[in-house]
Amino acid sequence: AHERMSGGSLGQQKSLLRQLKQMAAEDERCGGQPLDKDPTFARRIAEIEMELRTLEAFNMRAIDKFSRDGELGGKALGAEANIFKIRSTEIQQRLTELKVEAINYYAMPYQIAALKHGWNEPAVGAEYANGCMPSYLHFRKVSIYSGSNEIQHGIIAKAQLGM
């Protein structure tokens, strides 16, 4: 249960959301306007932010339950850990997808030298674009480790529905 509750770092997801908002505010693909002025993209950012806040509240309730009734009280987290793992990995993946979409083709170049101290060449695209695609690809695996999301769904079904 512990690895599933920590598998999707809320702090990391909040950081990804801040980066996404910065990208959307600076990118001017929407008819010369920042991307966050595009109603469709702004709605998608708002949706993921609401999901992240809901997940944070869910996590706090689970931690509270565990701290009151946890292993010392003879109970462990039940489906909460599985649900948190599923939702947090889905949110992580959607955040990185939106980041790649926000910077468009600038997501592709990976300038490893630009990350080194002393780099003074112009970067391809915005500074925050560097490493965006590797991050996106890295977060494809989060739905697999700590038990794939499909396995987590099965565990929830067995535990909660008696299947």
Residue ranges and their predicted role:
Residues 32, 53-122:
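C-terminal helix-coil-helix/basic helical segment that borders enzyme active sites and/or dimer interfaces
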Residues 1-55, 142, 158:
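Glycine-rich beta->alpha junctions and the first turn(s) of the following alpha-helix
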Residues 1-10, 106-163:
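Glycine-rich phosphate/cofactor-binding loops in nucleotide/flavin-utilizing enzymes
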Residues 1-6, 41, 69-84, 137-143:
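Short beta-alpha connecting loops at secondary-structure transitions
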Residues 18, 34-43, 74-81, 121-133:
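Glycine-rich, flexible loop segments associated with nucleotide phosphate handling
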Residues 43, 79, 86, 93, ...:
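A generic structural signal for well-ordered alpha-helical surface patches
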Residues 19-27, 48, 58-61, 65, ...:
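Generic, well-ordered alpha-helical scaffold segments in large soluble proteins
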